[in-house]
Regions:
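Rhodanese-like catalytic fold shared by cysteine-dependent sulfurtransferases
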Residues: 2-6, 18-50, 55, 74-102, ...
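Residue-level signal for mature regions of secreted extracellular proteins and peptides
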Residues: 11-12
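Short acidic/histidine-rich motifs immediately flanking catalytic phosphotransfer sites
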Residues: 60, 103
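Structural scaffold elements adjacent to functional motifs in cytosolic proteins
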Residues: 63-66
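Solvent-exposed coil/turn segments that connect beta secondary-structure elements
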Residues: 68-70
Length: 145
């Protein structure tokens, strides 16, 4: 009987030792994961259509990027917007958006592509990117070509 109790105690000690080793390994992983997350913090700011309109009315130096397709842009876009489709941002932004600190307001149809385009701009080094969703939620004037 004493041997069985001793065997159970030894087994418990071994399990505890194994559990402690794994906990230490996990803490290292969590720490490394936190550092990775801190590096990925760079992002754009999401604002409402109303806030974007206020910036357009008050800011002196900004650019509006429409991240939709050429066809969608022709159907109607925000006045003074330039068309750079989301899938062309990486190729065209360096040539068309030369000041990386300039205020850039980005929109698309519903907000999905403008989020992708905005994050791509940030990853390219642009520092003042604001995404304001889609033109379907834009209650102000639009123009057509």
């Amino acid at each position: 009987m004493v041997q069985k109790i001793l065997a159970v105690l030894m087994f418990a000690v071994m399990l505890t030792a194994c559990g402690t080793e794994n906990a230490e390994d996990n803490s290292i992983s969590v720490s490394e994961s936190a550092e990775t997350t801190e590096d990925a913090v760079l992002t754009y700011e999401q604002i409402s259509a109303e806030d974007a309109k206020k910036l357009m009315d008050t800011a002196s130096d900004y650019i509006i990027v429409d991240a939709r397709t050429t066809e969608e842009f022709a159907e109607g876009h925000i006045p003074n917007a330039i068309l750079i489709p989301e899938y062309e941002i990486a190729d065209r932004a360096p040539d068309e958006l030369t000041d990386k600190d300039r205020l850039i307001l980005v929109y698309c149809r519903s907000g999905r592509r403008s989020k992708i385009a905005s994050q791509a701009l940030v990853e390219l080094g642009y520092t003042n990117v604001k995404e304001f969703g889609g033109i379907i939620d834009w209650p102000y004037d639009v123009v057509t070509d």
